[in-house]
Structure formats: structure tokens, C-alpha cells
């Protein structure tokens, strides 16, 4: 165990966080006591509702790295993991990147015809806790009421299927998108990314990877068509902010992230 680690990792299971921190000379924490006593070392963690590392980092002005399911390219099994600095998702401005990593993912980018319905994705409990939203039901009610101020379109609230197996096989979001959908409204759900990659406009009400391609809620009745070039640049950028475990282990993830955040104070 290093007495002077470059980074401390915090997670219930270290299969995502461990490879990332160890590649740069860090290690996993010994527990909550070490997290709360740390005032100098950057931290990495997973689990959006596991806020101890984030709270401690913010309290003492430390950088933290958050690791979670990747934005694009995961299918039945999770092989890609997003890593963002001082945020739950990458929200810094889009930077130009080549297409190599995006092509490697081989994602389905079929453009779907827009229909008439507005899909609203509720915030689940863990996400609301991470973002400090005390009552997800109130958020949903207020969001639906706001949408009704600007459109008479049918509003469909799509709750997340409990089983990942169901989500990726029989009750898929991609299927819902093809069912007469005009736009998707999220807080910070990855459903927004999936919608945009198929040409369905998104309104992101919270800080998310969709922030820079998001429309405004006031435009919900007739959101502009997504710009093809902007969407391409955005998807390339996302592909440079998510990594496989082998890329974390090799230090590739760290190297790319340093380039991504080099100009961000």
C-alpha cells in the first residue's frame, strides 16, 4: 500500500475505479474514515449516491473523478465507462476530436422520423440524491406542468425498466423512440444521448452530456432539428470521455483525460 498515493479511489467494488487509480500510482481507500480525513489527495469514485468522496473533495478544493456507465456503445454488457472531472458527466465545451474512437464503437445512428409525442424521463432515487433533488416526484410533476405550458402534444412518462436485461432486450428505449416521438426531456439521463444519436431532439434540464446539444423547454412544441455536423462532433467528443477497463489499466484513459481538461481551470 502506497503511503503517498497520487489518488484515492472509493467504491463498493473496485472493478471500475481500481484500474483507473492504480494506473497513476493511486490506490483504493481503506474506508470512510480515510475519505473523511483526506484533505490533500484527489479522489475517484463510482456510485452517484455515494457522495462521501465528492463532498470531501468539494469541501477541501480537491479534484475528483467520477466513473459510471459509458455514454455510448454499451449493449447487453457494460464495456465502456465514462470518466468525468469534478462532475457526474462531461459538461465542459465540446472539443474537436478525430472519428477513430467513435467508429470503433460501431453504434447504430439510424435517423428516426420525428412524431408527435414528448417522452419525459423521470429522475430515479439515486440520481436525485446525487444532484440534491429532494423529491423526484415533485420534479416530474413540475416538469410535466412546464411542458404543458408550451405544447398540447401528448406527454409520455417513461419509467426505467427495473431489469437491465429487460432494458436491453424487450423494453428498449430505442423502441420507444420509434413510437411517434418528437422530443425527449431529461434531467441527466443517458436516454438523452441515445435519442440525439438517432436524431431526436433533447431538452436537458440538468447538467449532462447533452447540455451542449440541448434545446430549450420553451421550444418543446417545435424543437429545431439537430445539426448533423454538431452531433458528429459531440459524439466524437463523448467517445473521448469514456474508456474500457483495459484503457484505464494501461493509463490511456488518464492520458486522454489530461488532454481533454488541459485548458479547463
Across the structure, where does each feature detected by a protein language model lie?
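N-terminal pre-catalytic "stem/leader" segment of glycosyltransferase-like enzymes
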Residues: 1-41, 127, 254, 259-265
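Structural motif
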Residues: 1-12, 40-41, 43-49, 68-69, 117-118, 122-124, 182-183, ...
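Extended catalytic core of nucleotide-activated donor transferases of GT-like folds
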Residues: 27-77
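Donor nucleotide-activated moiety binding/catalytic core segment of transferases
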Residues: 31-35, 148, 153-203, 207-208
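Short, solvent-exposed loop/turn segments at secondary-structure junctions
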Residues: 47-50, 70-72, 124-127, 161-164, ...
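Leloir-type glycosyltransferase catalytic cores
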Residues: 76-116, 213-265
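Conserved catalytic-core segment of nucleotide-activated headgroup transferases in glycan assembly
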Residues: 113-164
Amino acid at each position: 500500500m502506497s503511503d503517498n498515493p497520487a489518488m484515492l479511489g472509493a467504491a463498493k467494488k473496485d472493478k471500475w475505479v481500481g484500474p483507473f487509480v492504480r494506473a497513476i500510482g493511486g490506490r483504493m481507500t481503506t474506508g470512510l474514515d480515510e475519505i473523511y480525513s483526506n484533505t490533500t489527495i484527489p479522489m475517484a469514485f463510482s456510485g452517484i449516491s455515494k457522495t462521501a468522496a465528492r463532498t470531501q473533495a468539494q469541501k477541501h478544493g480537491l479534484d475528483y473523478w467520477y466513473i459510471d456507465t459509458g455514454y455510448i456503445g454499451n449493449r447487453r454488457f457494460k464495456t465502456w465507462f465514462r470518466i468525468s472531472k469534478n462532475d457526474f458527466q462531461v459538461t465542459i465545451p465540446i472539443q474537436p476530436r478525430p472519428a477513430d474512437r467513435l467508429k470503433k464503437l460501431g453504434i447504430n445512428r439510424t435517423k428516426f422520423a420525428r412524431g408527435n409525442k414528448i417522452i419525459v424521463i423521470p429522475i430515479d432515487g439515486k440520481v436525485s440524491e446525487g444532484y440534491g433533488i429532494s423529491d423526484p416526484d415533485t420534479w416530474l410533476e413540475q416538469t410535466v406542468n412546464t411542458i404543458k405550458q408550451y405544447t398540447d402534444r401528448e406527454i409520455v412518462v417513461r419509467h426505467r425498466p427495473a431489469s437491465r436485461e429487460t432494458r436491453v432486450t424487450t423494453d428498449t428505449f430505442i423502441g420507444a423512440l420509434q413510437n411517434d416521438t418528437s422530443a425527449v426531456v431529461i434531467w441527466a439521463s443517458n436516454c438523452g444521448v441515445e435519442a440525439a444519436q438517432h436524431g431526436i431532439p433533447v431538452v436537458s434540464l440538468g447538467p449532462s452530456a447533452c447540455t451542449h446539444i440541448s434545446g430549450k423547454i420553451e421550444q418543446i412544441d417545435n424543437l429545431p432539428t439537430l445539426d448533423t455536423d454538431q452531433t458528429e462532433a459531440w459524439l466524437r467528443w463523448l467517445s473521448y470521455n469514456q474508456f474500457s477497463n483495459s484503457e484505464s489499466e494501461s493509463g490511456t484513459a488518464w492520458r486522454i483525460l489530461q488532454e481533454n481538461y488541459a485548458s479547463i481551470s
